[in-house]
Amino acid sequence: VWGRALGWYMATSALVAQILPEGRFKEEITDYAVSLAKCLVEFQDKEDGMWYQVVDKGNKKDNWKESSCTCLFTFGICKLIQMGVLDDKKYTDAAKKAYNTIIREYIGEENDDVFVKNVCMGTGVGDYDYYISRPIKDNDLHGTGAFTLMATQYYKTFEESGGHNER
């Protein structure tokens, strides 16, 4: 499963779940988003909290850690935590680990410019070999947008609340 495609599904599911009026559709979308978050945490790299370009093949030697999907997954998990529908401490830990690794290892700086590193360039539909052979780029807008969403939501979830969303 290609990371960024699934990342957008995670992010938009969480956003839609938040804005829908109470009722069956809100409940169904929320359940989908929560189920996806629970599944994604199982594929997260246990050491640094990143996700792979091909999410369900992290054990393959040629697969690589991709920042835009990690940002989108972290955004969705943080949104669900903020909504109060994902309240197990392991999800808070997963979000914090991913966020801190992105900040520490995947943000670059050069000539007063700040950018996101290790982003898969634009991608069409393909198989495993296609996805892992895609060019890796620094300062690609796919990463910048995903990072901005993640950082803003992380702040709203954990900082703006004064830590009240800590689980």
Language model feature labels by segment:
Residues 1-11, 71-73, 147:
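Alpha-helical bundle segments that constitute or directly flank the non-heme di-iron/ferroxidase center
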Residues 62-65, 69, 74-167:
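CBM-like carbohydrate-recognition segments
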Residues 1, 8, 32, 94, ...:
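Soluble or luminal CAZymes and related metallo-dependent hydrolases
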Residues 10-58, 62:
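Oxyanion-binding "anion nests"
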Residues 5-6, 55-59, 90, 120:
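Solvent-exposed, flexible loop/coil residues
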Residues 1, 24, 28-32, 65-68, ...:
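Alpha-helix N-cap and loop-to-helix initiation/capping positions
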